[in-house]
Amino acid sequence: MRYVEYGKENNNIILLLHGGGLSWWNYEEAAKSLQKDYHIILPILDGHAESDKPFTSIEDNAIEIIEFIDTHFEGSVLLMSGLSLGGQVLLEILSQRNDICKYAIIESALVKPSKLTHAMIKPAFGSCYGLIKYKWFSKLQFKSLKIRSDLFEFYFRDTCAISKKDMIAFLQANSLYSLKESIKNCTAKVHVFVGSEENAAMQESAVSIHHALRESLLQVLPKWHHGEFSINHGEDYANKVREIIGD
């Protein structure tokens, strides 16, 4: 697994896990804001642009990150955060290692498996994968994701770099992930965020995560869509990180 880093001179470690189909730039604005006081690490999940290996599973990504933290930071960091697929990887990390971080942020992570969605992914991408290399098609996708316009070139470049096999693999993994029983043993102070404009499954997932983590805090973000908090409002996100750590 590869990593992008900011603020290497600082001792307190914050690790941020990007969403599926995106990359480290998901958190670039927040990372640049936080780098004065924290060492920010942005892993590039397997199977994504600039990654060093194909995607296998959410569990394997979690193991890689745990091993990285064990090797470089004596088994724990200050805060970890994850959006969507990255949020699922973080939930898996917290399930496997309950004390790996002091604080955690879960943003829009799906934990309501859908066999129907899983079954539809392969035929859907089999017919339209080739279109992602056309800007007109990519712009339609990008617009539907509600990502701020200045990130389009990053999005287009990186989606074109993801193989069909990897894209199907991580989308299928995303559609089937569910919480592990061991998540209840997590000792981190967890904050769960979801946009009010997200679909019902995502809203229900946020509630399920909140209930599974008894000491967690759940916040519904008014008028925001999937991933808008960390992607489109990086400075607000950075301020929330500071607020959480300050608690």
Language-model features: locations:
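Conserved alpha/beta-hydrolase "acid-adjacent" motif
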Residues: N199-S205
